[in-house]
């Protein structure tokens, strides 16, 4: 047993010497200062640090280092930390001065990178460098903590949302989006000051994408990201990846994305899009395919009764989604290739149960068979066509449904229909163009932005992705 312990100590000394000798740690800890080195075998690292001008004290167990005064150290170096990580990081933070450095050196894979990133964020550290070979993390003590949602946070989230987006969001709407989603709840990361004030927020809700490409059919878990915001008083804290939003995004990616979803996506513009692409690995797929139908110029006349009967189409306004919509999705999804899984469970949550939004839901039937559906919202003289799914074997169902909708008393004021109409699948865009839809610049210069995790979907997105406004949180 004694020989085994000696071999283990020798192995650890070699690993630490290789990764954290005078060529490495002086770069990570550039200013000579007071350092506590916590290691089962502190030599030769202690000597290397002392030679670089640091005042070095050592301990084998940080939790037992009671002789060190609070907020007295410039740096703490942890070598292969053992024990409850949360307690260890809390103890290190207590001993560090403001802006003090924490270096973590791991010579074994026992310390999981994801767990460490989350723990550092939640303990009040900003990560300066991470994943250096071998596992070396450098962090700095800060006066903000990043963590996932806790009960009651919505009391600060909703006022911040109102201030950030100039829109009033009810508690019912927030609960629907983040508590009642059938595919997962409370995917929220937040930064708080030491006084408990919400400083930054990043969130998303789970969706499932259905893919049928090259004979393969599968489901891709994803997150639709939105509600990205920072309290104006704290926007000066850090820059880029060390800003409060950057730290919150890193926590979110580690806690909710890596190893859990294929990708996340969202629709944004301006500063947040530039930030996402510069600092958190986002890519812009394309400008949004904004299309407008001028109702006065391109009237969609209803067919006469005789022709209508012969064609066999019937359009109904509906209130809920049932098993017929599951059957439609199974039947037509191969024609769309890649899209959010629009089954009855998702549609019922997304549209039938969504509070504070008046959606108009329509279904079109050929004889007794469901061949398509659509969802609309009315905004003054604009009718927003937010979602749709049609059987391509019944292309006239699109015109039949739109004509019936425009003829309904609820929509008599509509002068335009606006929609995001992708060029994928080709028949879908072709049908829209044949009805008179025209491409226009998207009013807010929004783009489709995504971040891959474990699966890079860009090539498949460009070839096959179908989406509409209802796939965002903007509809």
Predicted region positions:
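Conserved beta-strand signature within the Rossmann-like core of class I S-adenosyl-L-methionine
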Residues: 99-107
């Amino acid at each position: 047993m004694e020989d085994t312990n000696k071999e283990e100590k020798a192995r650890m000394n070699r690993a630490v010497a290789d990764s954290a000798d005078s060529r490495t740690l002086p770069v990570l800890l550039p200013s000579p200062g007071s350092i506590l080195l916590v290691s089962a075998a502190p030599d030769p690292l202690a000597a290397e640090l002392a030679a670089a001008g640091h005042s070095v004290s050592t301990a084998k167990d940080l939790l037992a280092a009671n002789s060190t005064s609070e907020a007295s150290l410039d740096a703490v170096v942890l070598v292969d930390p053992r024990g409850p990580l949360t307690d260890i990081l809390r103890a290190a933070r207590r001993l560090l001065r403001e802006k003090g450095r924490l270096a973590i050196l791991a010579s074994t894979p026992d310390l999981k990178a994801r767990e460490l990133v989350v723990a550092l964020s939640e303990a009040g550290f900003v990560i300066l460098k991470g994943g250096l070979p071998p596992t070396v993390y450098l962090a700095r003590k800060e006066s903000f903590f990043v963590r996932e949602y806790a009960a009651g946070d919505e009391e600060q989230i909703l006022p911040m949302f109102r201030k950030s987006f100039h829109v009033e969001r009810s508690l019912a709407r927030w609960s629907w989006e983040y508590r009642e989603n059938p595919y997962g709840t409370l995917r929220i990361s937040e930064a708080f000051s030491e006084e408990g004030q919400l400083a930054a927020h990043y969130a998303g809700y789970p969706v499932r994408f259905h893919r049928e490409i090259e004979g393969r059919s599968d489901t891709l878990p994803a997150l639709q990201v939105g509600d990205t915001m920072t309290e104006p008083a704290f926007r000066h804290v850090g820059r880029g990846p060390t800003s409060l939003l950057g730290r919150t995004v890193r926590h979110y990616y580690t806690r909710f994305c890596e190893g859990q979803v294929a990708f996340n996506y969202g629709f944004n513009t301006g500063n947040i899009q530039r930030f996402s692409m510069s600092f958190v690995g986002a890519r812009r797929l394309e400008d949004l395919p904004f299309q407008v139908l001028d109702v006065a110029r391109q009237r969609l006349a209803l067919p006469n009764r005789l022709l209508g009967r012969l064609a066999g189409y019937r359009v109904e306004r509906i209130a809920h989604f049932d098993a017929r919509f599951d059957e439609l999705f199974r039947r037509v999804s191969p024609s769309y290739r890649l899209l959010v899984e629009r089954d009855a469970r998702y549609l019922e949550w997304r549209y039938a149960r969504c509070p504070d939004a008046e959606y108009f839901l329509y279904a079109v039937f050929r004889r007794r068979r469901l061949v398509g559906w659509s969802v609309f919202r009315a905004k003054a003289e604009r009718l927003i066509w937010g979602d749709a799914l049609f059987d391509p074997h019944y292309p006239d169902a699109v015109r039949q449904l739109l004509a019936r909708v425009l003829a309904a008393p609820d929509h008599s004021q509509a002068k335009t229909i606006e929609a995001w109409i992708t060029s994928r699948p080709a028949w879908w865009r072709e049908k829209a163009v044949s009805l008179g839809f025209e491409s226009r610049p998207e009013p807010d210069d929004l783009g489709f932005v995504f971040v891959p995790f474990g699966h890079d979907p860009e090539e498949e997105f460009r070839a096959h992705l179908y989406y509409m406004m209802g796939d965002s949180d903007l509809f």
